[in-house]
Amino acid sequence: YHEWFDRRRDPDGDDLVSIIHPWESGWDASPRWDAPMHLHHPSVHETHAARDAHMQILHAYGHDAQKLAADGYFCVESVEFNAIRVADLQALARIAAILNQPAGVWTSRAAAITAAIQQKFITPGGIFDLSGPDETPIQVPSSAPFILLFGACIDPATAAALVQQLKSDRFWPTYPVPTTPTDHPAFVGDHYWRGNVWMSVNWLIYTGLRTMGYTAAARELAYRRLDLVEQHGFYEYFNPITGHGNGPAQQSWTAVVLDMIATAQ
């Protein structure tokens, strides 16, 4: 699996893998993807139509990341995708140790990706995804950088700065953590991926806070999640200001709130 990523999704050999469709990130219609998808202030319908149309492009290009990037199509080195990959490699190393198998191959890959994350994603101006062969920063704020905590792939100073940003009003409204900050022009609390609370994203941030030692912030986030579900029910995603649930009711992944509460004690 990881060899496939290295072979097929790292055309420039910099240890950061690329995604070639917004769906691969899970953040389907995030404002982060507007520019690389050649969208300008899109409607919900326009983002949906663009994602569907992009599938035809992928088929035409044989899902070749290098060719897609060269011709200006969506090919993005995603902050949280690479952070999650580091966490996965670290988990494989722990499994290998339990099985008395060599863990070095996993730890060395995790270390290489961590170094690339720190060198390329983290800049004085912010932490941004990189688009295309020129690695153009996508300067759209989001909660994706907080998932670097989950990968434990940042130094303590960067972690402290991220937590300070996380606890700001724009990311810590009545029901944190929105995918797009509440003061951003693209924020729409009830529109799909334009600034909602997603339990899956919040679980990654919560786990990252615990991993990096920010247990008080993690506990507060867990109990705010419980409050959200108690007041507004189980839904796919929520408005961070009103708590209004959107998408399918009884969405299964919202049950991660149980893990958050169980481990926040």
Where are these regions (language model features)?
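Extended, well-ordered alpha-helical scaffold segments
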Residues: Y1-F5, D88, L92, L99-Q118, ...
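Aromatic- and glycine-enriched pocket-lining scaffold segments that form the walls
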Residues: Y1-R7, P22-W23, V76-L92, A96
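Charged, solvent-exposed alpha-helical segments that act as regulatory interaction surfaces
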Residues: R7-D14, I98
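Amphipathic, non-membrane alpha-helical segments in soluble helical-bundle scaffolds
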Residues: C75-A83, A103, T107, G195
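Peripheral, non-catalytic segments that deliver or gate enzyme domains
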Residues: S78, D190-Y214
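Well-ordered alpha-helical scaffold segments within catalytic/enzyme domains
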Residues: A83-Q101, I147-A157, W203-T215, V257-Q265
